[in-house]
Amino acid sequence: MNKKLIYLLFFIPFISQNIKAQNINSEKNDSLYKDFKTEFIWEAKVKIGKTIDIGESKCGTRRVIPITGGTFSGPKIKGEVLPGGEDWQLVRPDGDTELYARYLLKTNEGHIFQVINNALIHVGDTNKSFYCKSVLDIEAPNNGPYGFLNHAIFLGTLKLPELKQNEEPYVIISVYKVL
């Protein structure tokens, strides 16, 4: 019998039981994830350029927003948002917006890492029901002080501030590590 097949037959039941055990509290039959705890990592002021409207596609309305720079800071990290990233958006037929942003951050010590931010934006009947949550994938150098960013799940929020007259457009992204 093939070694890979034997391996799969042996480990799949173990893995599936282990996953089930991690997700369900056997005493209450509740998800263990209902009480997430997070740690604030940074807040970024991300400057954005003029929207490039691609138009209607088979999936909805496509647009791209250039990321032109910015800054970020948190209790253990501080630096700049490098220009050159992009925020790809899809406005779905139901009105929600899917966001895929990819950009680089550079710390004050010169360490550069990549951020991929996947978000969902939903605006309800009133502007008070604005919902925007994201999951971030952060790729940092392993051998530096920020290698810990490679080993966690990060959640984010997005705020659209009111701009002052002649102020360059920007968004505020807050990032939290799931503990």
Language-model-detected regions and their locations in the chain:
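Bacterial Sec-dependent N-terminal signal peptides
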Residues: M1-I24
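Beta-strand-enriched cores of mature, soluble protein domains
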Residues: Q22-L179
